[in-house]
Structures are given as C-alpha cells and as structure tokens.
Amino acid sequence: MSDEIRASHILVDIKSRSKEEAKTAIKKIISDLNDGNDFAELAREHSDCPSGSDGGDLGRFGKGAMVPEFEKAAFDLEIGSTSDAVETSFGYHLIHRTE
C-alpha cells in the first residue's frame, strides 16, 4: 500500500445545519452520483469545504494528515472508487480516490 494517495471529497458540514439535515443532504448527493453525475461537479455545487471550488481535490496526502475516520476510508478505497458517507467531527464526507 502506498504511503501517499490523492483524493477528492465532498463535505456536508454540521456547523451550518443540523446533523439530520446533513444526512439528508449527503444522501441526495449519493443519489446524484448513482445517477451518473460527475463527482467534481457535485463537489463544486455542494461541498462546504474550500476544496469544492477545485472539484473537491485535496491533492496528495499521507497517513496522519487527515482525521482518522477520513484517513481510513480514503486509504481503504481502490483508485477510481468512491466511499459511502463517512462521518467525522466536521460532518459527512464522500471521498473519491484518484491516485
């Protein structure tokens, strides 16, 4: 397994909405992805992270750079695949591993 990966994500935060609203929003984004919508475009439209303007691209990162729940999910993904919703202290993430 590589020491570094590259991934993009979509964050639906729990600072600006309730946890239930965030769950509903992330489920809608998952549905849009399953309908064939582009991950980067959905990140630009819906992500609460500044990386959203870059299609959710987080660049390359190694272990220890992200919160544990995010890191585990990202490193467990196959290249080209997208996670289910991952809950962290920031909210709900969809992670797409690109490298």
Regions found by a protein language model. Name each.
Residues 6-14, 39-47, 70-73, 84-99:
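FKBP-type peptidyl-prolyl cis-trans isomerase
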Residues 67, 79-83:
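Charged low-complexity stretches with an acidic bias
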Residues 1-34, 50-65, 95-99:
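Well-structured core secondary-structure elements of compact alpha/beta domains
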Residues 74-78:
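Soluble sensory domains of the PAS superfamily and closely related sensory modules
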Residues 35-40, 80:
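Glycine-centered tight-turn and secondary-structure capping sites
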